């Protein structure tokens, strides 16, 4: 099938082939548009442009659906652990049995330690440096420790590179946090599961499972591990978003893969991308009380006010974000099972959501709660500091970046990214 483009100036007709998709709309192959017509396509933000063909994740924005390699996100969250989802994204296959699942996880656990020299680098940062700045730098430094990943040839080479960074990113992130607060570094405990180990490195004390002495709480509960596991799964991949596209673009230059991942971390840092969950919680704090919600909703509608309600709306979803639905259910479940929530912020969030889902202003603009709206309150309940919300996103998304990178570098269509411009200067 083809599409005909007609130039109304000279009635010239040009035929362009379409590309079939297994899900979603077809695409028109405009790769030879300039060569054929002398025109570029102009698409700021690339909202109508597909830069690659992918088998990793698919979003149906109208129906509110998300798939990882053909599997519904709801099924993956309900039936599989995050490490199983990592295996799916990297290899295309879920584990066939518990032994395969454990084998993959044990490899991640054993690769979780980082070179001691990295500790000196983290200590050199100012105490107020944002953890995302430190994390991006730490991953970039990893490229100097594993220079062989610059030249990969076999599938085993690619998988080793990806599994190594997926294993080490939680350790690097935990070091960033503990370095910031001046707490002793907690080394990975390979006797713990991959996900429990993350909470342990963030909240633990050396030689003890004690978390917060003032609250008299000991250990990390299975319920907390399960909740955190689901959060990571929900953040594992999400199509060609800004950070994933950044990883692909940087990788297209032939750079070390960890440098491309570092660039993805920098892209995710932005408050319009991964930093949004941090902004949601800060905004709920700003609202302060349920009685103030109406006033802030009015500000959203005021054309003369630049105030934006964080945690609502999405570039792709024009209905309820399926990840947000899952997180809302998870938040309610944690509350019912006795996990301590910030009641004040939870009440404010519930009131904001109640109004937004009924108000025509939000409905007409497809402003539904997104994944960031609920993740912050859950992370706080898991005693994750607000400044560390975005690094948690990095932990979950690193495997998706690796999958995107591998798909790009192994594609026969791979070439260095070089967009055009419409020059309007002198």
Swiss-Prot record:
It holds the Pfam family Citrate_synt. One of its GO terms (molecular function) is citrate (Si)-synthase activity. It comes from the Bacteria. One of its GO terms (biological process) is tricarboxylic acid cycle. Its EC number is 2.3.3.16. The keyword Transferase applies. It catalyses: oxaloacetate + acetyl-CoA + H2O = citrate + CoA + H(+). SUPFAM superfamilies: Citrate synthase. PROSITE patterns: CITRATE_SYNTHASE. The keyword Transferase applies. CDD domains: EcCS_like. Keywords: Transferase, Tricarboxylic acid cycle. It is an enzyme of class 2 (transferase). Citrate synthase is found in nearly all cells capable of oxidative metabolism. This is Citrate synthase. It comes from Helicobacter pylori (strain J99 / ATCC 700824). The gene is gltA.
């Amino acid at each position: 099938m083809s599409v005909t483009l007609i130039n109304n100036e000279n009635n010239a007709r040009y035929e362009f082939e379409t590309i079939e998709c297994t899900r979603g709309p077809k695409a028109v192959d405009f790769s030879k548009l300039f060569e054929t017509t002398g025109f570029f396509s102009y698409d700021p933000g690339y909202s109508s442009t597909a830069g690659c063909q992918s088998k990793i994740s698919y979003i149906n924005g109208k129906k509110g659906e998300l798939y990882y390699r053909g599997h519904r996100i709801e099924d993956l969250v309900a039936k599989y652990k995050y490490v199983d989802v990592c295996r799916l994204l990297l290899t295309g296959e879920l584990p066939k049995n518990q032994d395969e699942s454990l084998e993959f996880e044990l490899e991640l656990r054993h690769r979780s330690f980082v070179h001691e020299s990295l500790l000196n680098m983290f200590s050199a940062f100012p105490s107020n440096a944002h953890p995302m700045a430190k994390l991006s730098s730490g991953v970039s430094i990893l490229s100097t420790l594993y220079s062989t990943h610059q030249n990969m040839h076999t599938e085993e080479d690619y998988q080793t590179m990806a599994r190594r960074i997926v294993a080490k990113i939680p350790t690097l992130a935990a070091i960033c946090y503990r370095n910031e607060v001046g707490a002793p570094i907690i080394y990975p405990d390979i006797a713990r599961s991959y996900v429990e180990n993350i909470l342990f490195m963030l909240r633990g004390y050396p030689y003890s499972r004690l978390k917060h002495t003032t609250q008299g709480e000991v250990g990390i509960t299975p319920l907390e591990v399960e909740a955190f596991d689901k959060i990571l799964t929900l953040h594992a991949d999400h199509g060609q978003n800004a950070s994933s596209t950044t990883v692909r673009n940087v990788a297209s230059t032939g750079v070390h893969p960890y440098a491309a991942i570092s660039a993805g971390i920098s892209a995710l840092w932005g408050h319009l991308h991964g930093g949004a969950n941090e902004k949601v919680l800060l905004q709920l704090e700003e609202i302060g009380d349920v009685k103030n919600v109406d006033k802030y909703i009015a500000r959203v509608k005021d054309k003369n006010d630049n105030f934006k309600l964080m945690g609502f709306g999405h570039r792709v979803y024009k209905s309820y974000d399926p990840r947000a639905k899952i997180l809302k259910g998870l938040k309610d479940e944690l509350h019912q099972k006795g996990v301590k929530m910030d009641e004040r912020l939870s009440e404010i969030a519930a009131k904001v959501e109640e109004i937004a889902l009924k108000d025509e202003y939000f409905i007409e603009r497809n402003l539904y709660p997104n994944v960031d709206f609920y993740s912050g309150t859950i992370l706080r309940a898991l005693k994750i500091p607000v400044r560390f919300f975005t690094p948690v996103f990095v932990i979950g998304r690193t495997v998706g970046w690796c999958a995107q990178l591998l798909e790009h570098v192994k594609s026969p269509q791979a070439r260095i990214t070089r967009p055009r411009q419409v020059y309007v200067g002198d």
